[in-house]
Amino acid sequence: MGAIAAGIAMAGAAIGGGVGDGIVISKMLEGMARQPELSGQLRTNMFIGVGLVEAMPIIAFVVALMVMNK
């Protein structure tokens, strides 16, 4: 049962991370199209946002390992 729960947790986190990355990057590209002079600042903020979004699957992986090792 723990393996099923771990698999579901990882699948949800991977889907959420992919969707979140797509949203962050698309909004950054929209901002760059509107104001090209801010592209450097937008790129920096995009990398921070992607890093925060990608933390979710990493945390889910650690939790999945903890659930499977119980």
Curated annotation (Swiss-Prot):
Stored Pfam families: ATP-synt_C (PF00137)
Keyword hit for Transport: yes
Membrane topology: Multi-pass membrane protein
Database matches in InterPro entries: ATP_synth_csu_bac/chlpt, ATP_synth_F0_csu, ATP_synth_F0_csu_DDCD_BS, ATP_synth_F0_csu_sf, ATPase_proteolipid_c-like_dom, F/V-ATP_Csub_sf
Keyword tags: ATP synthesis, Cell membrane, CF(0), Hydrogen ion transport, Ion transport, Lipid-binding, Membrane, Transmembrane, Transmembrane helix, Transport
Single GO molecular function: lipid binding
GO CC terms in record: plasma membrane; proton-transporting ATP synthase complex; proton-transporting two-sector ATPase complex, proton-transporting domain
Domain of life: Bacteria
Subcellular location as annotated: Cell membrane
Primary residence: membrane
Membrane-crossing segments per the record: 4-24, 47-67
Site feature Reversibly protonated during proton transport, where: E54
PANTHER family assigned to the protein according to its UniProt record, in alphabetical order: ATP SYNTHASE LIPID-BINDING PROTEIN, MITOCHONDRIAL (PTHR10031), ATPASE PROTEIN 9 (PTHR10031:SF0)
NCBIfam families: ATP_synt_c (TIGR01260), PRK06876.1 (NF005363)
Protein function: F(1)F(0) ATP synthase produces ATP from ADP in the presence of a proton or sodium gradient. F-type ATPases consist of two structural domains, F(1) containing the extramembraneous catalytic core and F(0) containing the membrane proton channel, linked together by a central stalk and a peripheral stalk. During catalysis, ATP synthesis in the catalytic domain of F(1) is coupled via a rotary mechanism of the central stalk subunits to proton translocation.
Assembly and oligomerization: F-type ATPases have 2 components, F(1) - the catalytic core - and F(0) - the membrane proton channel. F(1) has five subunits: alpha(3), beta(3), gamma(1), delta(1), epsilon(1). F(0) has three main subunits: a(1), b(2) and c(10-14). The alpha and beta chains form an alternating ring which encloses part of the gamma chain. F(1) is attached to F(0) by a central stalk formed by the gamma and epsilon chains, while a peripheral stalk is formed by the delta and b chains.
Family (UniProt): Belongs to the ATPase C chain family.
Name listed for the protein in its UniProt record: ATP synthase subunit c
Species this chain originates from: Levilactobacillus brevis (strain ATCC 367 / BCRC 12310 / CIP 105137 / JCM 1170 / LMG 11437 / NCIMB 947 / NCTC 947)
Source species taxonomy: Bacteria, Bacillati, Bacillota, Bacilli, Lactobacillales
Gene encoding the protein: atpE
